[in-house]
Amino acid sequence: MSAAPSLIAQQIKPTSRGYAPANGIQVYYEVYGEGKPVILLHGAYYTIEMNWGELIPELAKTRKVIALELQGHGHTPYSDRKLSRSTLASDVEKVMDYLKIDSADVVGYSFGGQIAYQFALQSPQRLKNLVIISAVYKSEGWLPEVNAVFKKMKPELFANSPLQTAYDAVAPDKTKWNKFLEQMIASAGEPFDLGDDNIAKITAPVLIISGDNDGMDKIELAKTYKLLGGGVSADMQAMPKARLAVIPNQSHVSLMRQTKIIFSYVDDFLQ
């Protein structure tokens, strides 16, 4: 799911940046701060700056922040390689290998949250804690009207949008914009399901953050939380490792602008 957020000015510069080889492509990354590593996975069509520009300075005060740009996004070149969640999750692991990071906390927003779920399933030994922000692990996690929009999306929707402006500012080849859009739109329109049974096997602590009107089906969200071990009476049994925060009066896009709120939940969870 995506929309056209306003551009966000990043307040600090990375301590290092570069490209890591990953499954036949070069994945762009930026590193900030020192401490325990936390990996940030952005939403569809976003760049690091657009998605995480306000949150990185806060996280980097006490942690090593590694922000990636997924296949075709931002600085990472467009590729005809098939766009699959399993391959993108493997790309994350390859970047970790390149940066010599054994394990890390992973934070994913929207499309990046889907990749974070996939990473948790296929690379559990590399995951410490998982933060999912307004993201689902199956198509049915979105409201029907959201899935209907995915199936009707056209490249023209993004013409001259802040998303295109952000892409043009950093993409190695701006002429790939339409090909990139076609690839992403095709992926968004395909039903997917990582599996209830698989989600229930995630052993890492999980924090889910959702906006009350972010397009996620809240009945499905409650089921997801239950699969992860939440939704219990903690007065009669131990507090679960899973946490759920539903932020009032927030849409899918506006949620990521609530930097202070999101940081307070994430910072407390990752302690």
Regions found by a protein language model. Name each.
Residues 1-38, 62-63, 271:
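Alpha/beta-hydrolase fold catalytic core
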Residues 25-75:
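Conserved HGGG/HGGXW glycine-rich cap/lid loop of the alpha/beta-hydrolase fold
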Residues 57, 212-250, 256:
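Conserved loop-alpha-helix segment in the C-terminal half of the alpha/beta-hydrolase fold
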Residues 60, 67-107:
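Active-site loop/oxyanion-hole signature of alpha/beta-hydrolase fold enzymes
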Residues 114-122, 128-164:
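Flexible "cap/lid" loop of the alpha/beta hydrolase fold
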Residues 183-198:
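Active-site nucleophile elbow and catalytic-triad environment of alpha/beta-hydrolase enzymes
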Residues 202, 208-210:
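Short beta-strand/loop motif that positions the catalytic acidic residue
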Residues 255-268:
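Post-His helix in hydrolase/transferase enzymes
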